[in-house]
């Protein structure tokens, strides 16, 4: 379920009848709870990709409901956390991030490429939902996965439209360069989709001025 997917705020839910896994904390947590019938006990955890406000801006609200939150060490250090509850640091083990088991969900974190401290993407598997690839805010997808049932992937901008918006004065050159260095273009997204075995695909984090 997509609850928010833009620079205004990102939040997604993978769920079955008994469990829910949150991806990102970028919208008011009350909206997340409303989507889950106000059943906070159904939530087995929340995964955060990086510290930017549209992805982690509501992290304290999630923590205050005593929902387990998981993120990289760099993300936790950079996020503005003032809750008395703390996120769990996803550790590196022998050059790879540790795998997580949250309820019936198995999570494999992997590094992504963004202008943040230590961004991650996640492969999530559940017996009822199969394999889901979640990757957002990255200019390149370094990993491939087989047997995917769903892909939630960033598709942020069209390079030609981005260049035209600079020429016409709609956005500054510095913003263009930041977008190119930290977000996934249409064409790079297509390359990533071709490299992965997939069924349904959902595009996330579409940005209005660059599409």
Predicted regions: what they are:
Residues 70-100, 105-110:
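Glycine/small-residue-rich loop that forms an oxyanion/phosphate-binding "nest" at active or ligand-binding sites
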């Amino acid at each position: 379920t997509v609850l928010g997917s833009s620079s205004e705020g990102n939040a997604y839910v993978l769920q079955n009848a008994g469990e829910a896994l949150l991806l990102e904390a970028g919208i008011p947590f009350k909206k997340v709870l409303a989507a889950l019938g106000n059943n906070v006990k159904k939530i087995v955890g929340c995964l955060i990709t990086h510290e930017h406000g549209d992805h982690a801006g509501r992290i304290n609200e999630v923590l205050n409901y005593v929902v387990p939150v998981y993120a990289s060490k760099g993300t936790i250090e950079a996020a503005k956390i003032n809750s008395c509850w703390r996120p769990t640091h996803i550790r590196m083990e022998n050059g790879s991030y540790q795998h997580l088991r949250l309820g019936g969900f198995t999570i494999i974190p992997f590094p992504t490429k963004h202008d943040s401290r230590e961004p991650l993407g996640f492969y999530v598997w559940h017996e009822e939902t199969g394999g889901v690839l979640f990757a957002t805010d990255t200019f390149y997808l370094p990993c491939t996965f087989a047997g995917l049932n769903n892909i939630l992937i960033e598709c942020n901008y069209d390079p030609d439209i981005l260049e035209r918006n600079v020429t016409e004065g709609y956005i500054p050159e510095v913003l263009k360069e930041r977008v190119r260095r930290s977000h996934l273009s249409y064409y790079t997204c297509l390359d990533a989709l071709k490299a992965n075995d997939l069924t349904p695909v959902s595009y996330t984090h579409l940005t209005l001025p660059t599409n």
